[in-house]
Structure formats: C-alpha cells, structure tokens
Amino acid sequence: DNTGKICDSLYVYSTSDNSWSAVQTDQQRPKGMYRTACCRMEDQAFLIGGRRGNELIDEVWTYEPSAFVWSKKSNFPIKQYGGISVVIGDRIYAGLGIINKADPSLEYTTQFWSTDKNAVAWEKEASFPGRMLLCAIAYGNYVYGVDGDGYIWRYDPDSQNWSQKSQLPAANRSVHCMYVLDNYIYIGLGNASNSLISYDPTWDN
C-alpha cells in the first residue's frame, strides 16, 4: 500500500460504474504478496510465486469468486517472482521469473512448467533459450512473449519448441503490457514510451 506495507486485501473492479470495492473472503487467504504471476482458468484465478519483502515464495493459490474461497495448491517447482503464467486449452504454463533478490543484477530463470487446473503436479516444459522474458500472452495455441532485447518469441506446447520472431522497433522495446484484442497483439507502455504497437502473428513467419 502507500505506506510500504504488503497488503493482503483483494478488490473487485466494476466495469458498469468504474469503481473498486473490497472483496470479503474467507480467512484462508494467503499472506500479502506482490510480483505474483497470475492467470485465470475456468472459474478460478491462479496466483503463482511472488515476494513477501525479501522472501521469495513458491506458493500457488487459487481464488474462486463465486464462492469467495481461497485454496492452497502444491508448491511451484522453484521460488520466483514476476515471470509469466498463461492458459492454453486445459493447461497453465508458468515460469521464467526472477530467482534472486539483488537489484540491479536480477537473475531470471529459463525454466518453464505446465500443470492442469488441479495444480497437483508441475511438468517440465522446454527451457527458454533467450534473455529474460518481460511479459507474455496466450494467442491461439501458442505462448507469445517479448524478451529484454525486444525480440518476440513464440512457444509451441505441442512440439515444446521456442522460436524467435521479429524485434520490436527501438522506441518500443521497453514493454509494460501485452494483450490480445481482435486477433492482434498489443505491446508497449514501458518506462521509455507511452505508445502501444499492434502485432499480427500471421505476418511474422
């Protein structure tokens, strides 16, 4: 929060009246954490890894909004914060987070895993061959991400293969967000740019 304390509150946003309100959840919710990799599968939100102050965590939690219930799952294979988590079909793909505490020499893992909605066991996927992946999304049956040098990467879960694609323009290589809308991937709004660019994967062969 604005005092520097790690917050354990949860809020819901209403698109109808542009407002935030606190969610009353059960007492089994996790302790406050940040830089957690998050995704949604079916009717549950998944929170993977993160930090509590100087502590890196490997916890995996789910939150079910319809029942206001938190559930703790099996731990993630490593302690990390940041990283990515996306859903393709009936699998969650996660990893590639930061595994040390020191700034500015942050160390990113190249390891990548997947699990099903029960999150009982994590299966190893192909390691990422590039430099730190800043963000990623699921598009079609692939994972698309942008690395620290502005290159777009595509991961094919079926073949377990990473392939390097185009490099973003120099002015757009500082990436804050990445999302899909109307069959385009939008990338940008980093600390060096206030613009978004659109990327069409069908152009980039």
List each language-model region with its residue ranges.
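Kelch-like beta-propeller repeat domains
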Residues: D1-N205
